[in-house]
């Protein structure tokens, strides 16, 4: 019911504020949705496949120095944060409340600052990103949040402040190292030829996948990465998946975002987040060869939402189409995309339980209900 309330409220908000362009009560709706998203995350109980691990980590009553030694593979920022919240009674729940407030506020504020169609973007965030960020990758979610805080400095090319906040990201998750290279896109010409050249470069990487795999393997086979690299590269389920990627996924995740950037550039309306969309496409291309790299797009998925929303909203067609036609395209495009992406929640995760059982039905800390199917998935994923 809690998910349904958020969904209905977002549909109403999209109609009122994104389609009809109403202003009255817009802030009220925005903050009501934010509070609901925070509450759902903060008061959740055993939701998400990594939840048990985090709950156990906070439950360990080790002395601080023992905790640091036992969990030496964790990043320092996370270790310090966990140690701090262990000073409170029920540390995990106190932490989760802080986490939910911080991460969801940062995400929604980023949405507000980067697209005109705020509630459409929040709907896509809720469906495609929210559950992973709030119930799965808590450490990486904090790293993503610090990256999003650095965006306004990146846009202004204030690289000193950008890298200071990036350091905070790395303190929570080593995957944030991929953000070191994002400013390099400013060295590239902002021309259509660059965007199509980028697409060609990615496709060549996919075509010569064995050579790319060999190169990346040896880049990551250094002391600070070797253990994790071996773990991910040698597991069968992280192996080659190029043949399993459908033509629709190629189109949606490679051709479409670059085409949308090209169209925006042609009209001199290249969005300020264009370099993050380019990073998204490169990482998606690499992840076709090495699927584990797909997790790096946790930093950039939100920008795909921005470019998609801005594109189908009619920005690129407004000189040729009527207002009602633009609205129709917007609704149809949003509906088709959401419908296609939603199918991932219905795929079987352990051969018998659909993926959505990790999050539905909802269970709160007030009733502490354990869902049988969810517990089966927990055991399957954590064995």
Language-model-detected regions and their locations in the chain:
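Short acidic/glycine- and proline-prone juxtamembrane loop motifs at membrane-interface regions
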Residues: 135-141
């Amino acid at each position: 019911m809690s998910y349904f309330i958020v969904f209905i409220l977002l549909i109403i908000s999209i109609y009122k504020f994104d389609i009809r362009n109403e202003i009255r009560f817009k802030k009220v709706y925005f903050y009501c949705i934010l509070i609901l998203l925070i509450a759902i995350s903060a008061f959740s109980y055993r939701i998400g496949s990594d939840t048990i691990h985090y709950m156990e980590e906070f439950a360990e009553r080790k002395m601080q120095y023992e905790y640091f030694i036992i969990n030496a593979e964790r990043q320092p920022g996370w270790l310090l944060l966990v140690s701090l919240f262990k000073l409170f009674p029920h540390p995990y729940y106190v932490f989760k409340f802080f986490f939910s407030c911080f991460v969801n506020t940062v995400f929604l504020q980023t949405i507000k600052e980067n697209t005109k169609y705020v509630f459409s973007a929040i709907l896509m965030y809720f469906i495609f990103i929210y559950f992973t960020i709030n119930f799965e990758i808590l450490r990486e979610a904090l790293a993503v949040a610090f990256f999003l805080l650095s965006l306004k400095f990146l846009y202004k090319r204030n690289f000193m402040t950008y890298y200071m906040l990036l350091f905070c990201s790395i303190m929570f998750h080593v995957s944030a190292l991929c953000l070191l290279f994002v400013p390099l896109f400013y060295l590239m010409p902002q021309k259509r030829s660059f965007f199509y050249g980028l697409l060609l470069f990615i496709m060549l990487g996919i075509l010569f996948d064995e050579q790319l795999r060999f190169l990346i393997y040896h880049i990551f086979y250094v002391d600070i990465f070797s253990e994790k690299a071996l773990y991910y590269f040698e597991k069968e389920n992280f192996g080659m998946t190029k043949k399993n990627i459908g033509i629709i996924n190629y189109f949606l995740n490679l051709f479409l975002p670059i085409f949308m950037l090209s169209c925006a550039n042609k009209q001199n309306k290249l969005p300020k987040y264009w370099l993050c969309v380019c990073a998204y496409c490169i990482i998606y291309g690499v992840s076709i060869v090495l699927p584990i790299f797909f997790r790096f797009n946790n930093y950039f998925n939100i920008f795909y939402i921005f470019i998609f929303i801005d594109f189908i909203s009619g920005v690129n067609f407004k000189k040729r189409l009527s207002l009602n036609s633009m609205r129709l395209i917007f609704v149809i495009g949003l509906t088709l995309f959401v419908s296609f992406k939603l199918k991932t929640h219905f795929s079987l995760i352990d051969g018998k339980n659909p993926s959505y059982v990790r999050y539905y039905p909802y269970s709160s800390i007030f009733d502490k209900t354990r869902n049988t199917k969810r517990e089966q998935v927990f055991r399957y994923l954590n064995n």
